[in-house]
Amino acid sequence: MSTENNSELLYNNSIKILTDLIGFKTISGEDNTALIDYCDDILKKLGATSFRTYDVEKKRVNLFATLKARNSNNKKPIILSGHTDVVPVSKGWSSDPFTATIREDKLYGLSLIHI
């Protein structure tokens, strides 16, 4: 497969994942289990190992995952950290904030730049 095809595939997969992520209504304080399940599934397909921690009510979940470097045991690890809750929807949206919308080569949706 050519580099151009690989780049296009990576771009399309990234847009698909971002589009899916925007669709999860994980407003602060609400259940985020479905989103964590989705992220865990993607990471496991990439070879990650993971574990979860829960709040007292078992509706807010933290996901910790480890993905080892490919082709080398000498590569240094990196840590990515983020959060899954979003702010409540405010006024002023011209489209559904939980539906990814592309306008003029820009992707819009609640939480896209929130991490």
Please annotate each region the language model reported.
Residues 113-115:
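Conserved small/polar residues in nucleotide/adenosyl-binding loops
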Residues 2-111:
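Acidic/His- and Gly-rich active-site-bordering loop/insert found
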